[in-house]
From Swiss-Prot:
Species of the source: Shewanella baltica (strain OS223)
Cited InterPro entries: ExoRNase_PH_dom1, ExoRNase_PH_dom2, ExoRNase_PH_dom2_sf, KH_dom, KH_dom_type_1, KH_dom_type_1_sf, NA-bd_OB-fold, PNPase
Name the record gives this protein: Polyribonucleotide nucleotidyltransferase
HAMAP family named among the record's database cross-references: PNPase
Keywords in alphabetical order: Cytoplasm, Magnesium, Metal-binding, Nucleotidyltransferase, RNA-binding, Transferase
UniProt binding sites for Mg(2+): 485, 491
Length: 699
């Protein structure tokens, strides 16, 4: 075995790429390391495409092995199971920038598997996974227009930071991942603390500039370790068939794309395509209908893009910077804690907000350590939203990705646990979809949170931008339709407040997207965002003054941390009795913070009263109403507070001589006692006769 190794410095870390030792039967295998975080990336491609396939079957599988962090998996089977949400998101992060780099017409199946085999808790594995994938594809021989570079950018104290550590990210105002080739940015994914447009654009440019060292290193690695490129040629088009289809369908498709209602437009497009196929079959019964479908799709794209470049109205009649009609409703469901219905044209989201206690928060145990999510956002995309039938069940990759994007857009304005001690779950049900449903989820979430009384810092709105570019001519589109997303060159989603951007996601399908074009898109998105925020604020401009009557109310009190064990009791007996008898949920923290949750105010008051009793200190000289719990020869033990007992000596029962304690006291008898002394060991000395004397004097 002769390993080929390439090492280079990248930000704070040394990156190492190695091949030739592990997984030698794959088309390519690279062991990629950044510090102590190491991933094994393998690539396998089929030399022949399956007959009849009309799409590119690329699969990216990202898997984190618990042994990488020196852990044994939990659960009964003690082995890794289905992909976690984090694994799904990173798989999408890798897939998005590499997919456009495969040539048009390439239909051979390709599978990329990334396995995390070692992890440094301060170095996230996603960036090195992207670098390793780029290197493996570069040396595999599979047609691929790489290399691809990747970088994470932070923003700390007004300075950009390349590949910040996990600790640095905790103080960073920005967490941005950018991937691209030597000449183009292809993908951006970010979360930010309402940063200005110029800072966000600067971070993209900075990240792309810094990753050139990666691209150069992979090119050198390929020169030394790369396999010969496959002998593959793109399928040629039949020029006569292209001309026939243009003559038969161009005018009809042009008319169909003037129909503004999506379902009616699709129906007419289907009519035009069916008539075209019928005419072609009449002249040539053996014609390949799959090729006809592909050429019709290309013609469709050309028709729509041509109209936009010529300055004609868009598919639904709008100008490039126009936003579709908005409808904003808050408080639409009677029993939810918060709800909103946000409609933008033919895209609609029904969003609900549910409040819970800290124990309702999501507990996540990953190879990067344990963490808790108090704010959850789940996105559902049922098939009826686009007028189709389909499987309904667990969320797919796309739904997980869109939900996380919306979460990033909102997270920056969420209150801290000290400000709002609730767990929050938001669910966005996409009930209609024609473009930008994730950004509709951002808007709907902002509204639902306010309706629920969650004190978010300010409203948040999201907008999806598009681009059509032909040569030096380009048009930036605001609030794109589904067709404009599919037929355009860029999908550019921006969420934010009036003050700045909270989330930015960008996927670019072509090269030649300049800094100037991105700047125009960001400025146009800002205008669209402010317009949407104005409409949203008319419906609900700030959070409700109070939470829903149906939501649990959390009351926070403080106790002496040394008294926590008294509230818990032996084996949890005291706190269990408290919760069962009052019907409340009680959570204790190490600093003495007690959170009591209940939708019944009287139950909360009773729980507080009992906790205060348990944690209160015994006062010398005070009279308590106690209960006799044990009788002995020399006196009786009386419980005066929960968990606190004292001794009434036989001499302190009565002014008269007491020969037998049982003649004066019995078990469970309630008596008034005065605290005479609490010694250094915490033992309490009580007196019944002194209490009676004091009460008599008071009378």
């Amino acid at each position: 075995m002769n390993p080929i190794v390439k090492s280079f410095e990248y930000g704070q870390h040394t990156v190492t790429l190695e091949t030739g030792v592990i997984a030698r039967q794959a088309d390519a295998a690279v062991l990629a390391s950044m510090g102590d975080t190491t991933v094994l990336v393998t690539v396998v491609g089929k030399k022949e495409a399956d007959a009849g396939r009309d799409f590119f079957p690329l699969t990216v599988n990202y898997q984190e092995k618990t042994y990488a962090a020196g852990k044994i998996p939990g659960g009964f089977f003690k082995r890794e199971g289905r992909p976690s949400e984090d694994e799904t998101l990173i798989a999408r992060l890798i897939d998005r920038p590499i997919r456009p780099l495969f040539p048009n017409g390439f239909k051979n199946e390709v599978q990329v598997i990334i396995t995390v085999v070692s992890v440094d808790p301060q170095i996230e594995p996603d960036i090195i996974s992207m670098i390793g994938t780029s290197a493996a594809l570069a040396i595999s021989g599979i047609p691929f227009s790489g290399p691809l570079g990747a970088a994470r950018v932070g923003y700390i104290d007004g300075e950009y930071v390349l590949n910040p550590s996990v600790a640095q990210l905790a103080t960073s105002q920005l967490n941005l991942v950018v991937a691209g080739t030597a000449g183009a940015v292809l993908m951006v994914e970010s979360e930010a603390q309402a940063l200005p447009e110029e800072v966000m654009l600067g971070s993209v440019v900075y990240g792309h500039d810094q990753q050139q060292v990666v691209i150069k290193a992979i090119a050198e690695f390929k020169a030394e370790a790369g396999k010969p490129t496959w002998d593959w040629t793109a399928p040629t088009q039949d020029a006569d068939l292209v001309a026939q289809i243009k003559e038969l369908a161009e005018a009809g498709l042009g008319d169909a794309y003037k129909i503004q209602v999506k379902q009616d437009r699709y129906a007419q497009v289907s009519v035009v395509k069916a008539a075209t196929k019928e005419a072609l079959l009449a002249s040539n019964p053996s014609i390949d209908l799959r090729e006809v479908d592909n050429l019709l799709g290309s013609l469709e794209k050309k028709v729509v893009r041509g109209r936009i470049i010529r300055g004609e109205p868009r598919i639904d009649g709008r100008e490039p910077d126009m936003i579709r009609a908005l409808s904003v409703l808050a408080g639409v469901l009677p029993r939810t804690h918060g709800s909103a219905l946000f409609t933008r044209g033919e895209t609609q989201a029904l969003v609900t907000c549910t409040l819970g206690t800290e124990r309702d928060a999501q507990k996540i145990d990953s190879i990067m350590g344990e963490r808790t999510n108090r704010f959850m956002l789940h996105y559902n995309f049922p098939p009826y939203s686009v007028g189709e039938t389909g499987m309904v069940g667990s969320p797919k990759r796309r739904e997980i990705g869109h939900g996380k994007l919306a979460w990033r857009g909102i997270n920056a304005v969420m209150p801290s646990a000290a400000e709002f001690p609730y767990s929050v779950r938001v669910v966005s049900e996409i009930t209609e979809s024609n473009g930008s449903s994730s950004m509709a989820s951002v808007c709907g979430t902002s509204l639902a949170l306010m309706d629920a009384g969650v004190p978010i810092k300010t409203s948040v709105a999201g907008i999806a931008m598009g681009l059509v570019k032909e040569g030096d001519d380009f048009v930036v589109l605001s609030d794109i339709l589904g067709d404009e997303d599919h037929l355009g060159d860029m999908d550019f989603k921006v969420a934010g407040t009036r003050d700045g951007i909270t989330a930015l996601q960008m996927d670019i399908k072509i090269e030649g997207i300049t800094k100037e074009i991105m700047d125009i898109a960001l400025q146009q998105a800002y205008g669209a965002r402010v317009h949407i925020l104005n409409v949203m604020d008319q419906a609900i401009g700030s959070h409700r003054d109070d939470i829903s009557d149906h939501a649990p109310r959390i009351t926070v009190i403080k106790i002496n941390p040394e008294k926590i064990r008294d509230v818990i009791g032996k084996g949890g007996a005291v706190i269990r009795a408290l919760t069962e008898e009052t019907g409340t949920t009680i959570e204790l923290e190490d600093d003495g913070t007690v959170k009591i949750a209940s939708s019944n105010g009287e139950a909360t008051k009773e729980a507080i009263r009992r906790i205060e009793e348990i944690t209160s200190e015994v006062e010398v000289g005070r009279i308590y109403n106690g209960k006799v719990i044990r009788i002995v020869d020399f006196g009786a033990f009386v419980n005066i507070l929960p968990g606190k007992d004292g001794l009434v000596h036989i001499s302190q029962i009565s002014d008269e001589r007491v020969a037998n304690v049982s003649d004066h006291l019995e078990l469970n008898q309630e008596v008034a006692v005065k605290v005479m002394e609490v010694d250094r060991q915490g033992r309490v000395r009580l007196s019944i006769k002194e209490a009676q004397t004091k009460e008599t004097a008071a009378e």
